[in-house]
Every structure is written in C-alpha cells, then in structure tokens.
Amino acid sequence: MLEMANQLSEDEEYSHALKFYKSILQIEPSNIGVIIDYGVTLQNLGLYHQALTTYDQALQLQPNNTSALINKGSILHTLEKYTDAITYYDMALQIDGDNPVALVYKGLCTAEIGNIQLAIKYFKKALSIDNEFELARVSIDTAKCIMKS
C-alpha cells in the first residue's frame, strides 16, 4: 500500500495518494515516515493548514525530525511567515548543521526579508556541502543578480 501511495505521489496524483496514506495511518498511526509523506501530499494539494497540523503530529512523536521541521518551515515560508519559517530551519540546523536543504530554505527566507548578502552565505554553505544542489546554485545566481541591480 505504501509503494502505491508513493508512486501516486510521484505521479502527482496527490488526491489518490492521500487516500492510501490515510489508510496506512489507520493501521500504523505512529509511522513517522507516512505521517510526513501525508503532510507533503497535503502541502502539494495546497492544504497548508492541514499539512501544518500533520507536521505538528510528526514533531510530537519525534521533536528532532529534520524532515518534519524543514517541511513545516517550507509551509510557513509559502504563507509568507518568513521569521517563523527560519525558526524551524534553525531547529533543523541545530540537529544537522550540514543540511543543505535547510540552509537553502533559510537563505530564501532571509532574502525575502531583505538580507540578500546573508542569504548568499547560506547558499554558498549549502553548495559547499552539496555542489550539485541545483536550488542552491539557482538561488545564489538570482541573489547575485539582485545585488547588482
């Protein structure tokens, strides 16, 4: 059932995937991976508040789960709550200081609140950890263009 849910999600059949994740959670309500996948699926459907609640459930089970922290931050970013999002990225970075996703997302929020130079530092650090991380590369190029204009 989990393979089917993941495949549907990969195929962007989020509504169908959601049904499978719900069924799995009825059997395994504490399966952290499924809870997070369910949250991601809700997020992909634009159901941000439901996804936030789902990530909160994951964090109640595992407060140091970096995936749940980063995903919660990404929703807060989408909702333009940049300072709140940064708080969650910082929490993830306290657990895993070399997490390139948390660094780039923190950089994106930092840029949104107007500190482009600091954002570039986060993008550079992410690239030093994973030099093939495309989002970091694109973000640093965009930030540099903004600085020049």
Residue ranges and their predicted role:
Residues 4, 120-121, 127-149:
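Terminal, low-structured helical/coil segments at or just beyond the last alpha-helical repeat
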Residues 9, 36, 43, 70, ...:
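Position-specific recognition of the canonical hydrophobic site in helix A of tetratricopeptide repeat
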Residues 32-33, 66-67, 100-101, 134-135:
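Helix-start (N-cap) detector for alpha-helical repeat units in TPR-like alpha-solenoids
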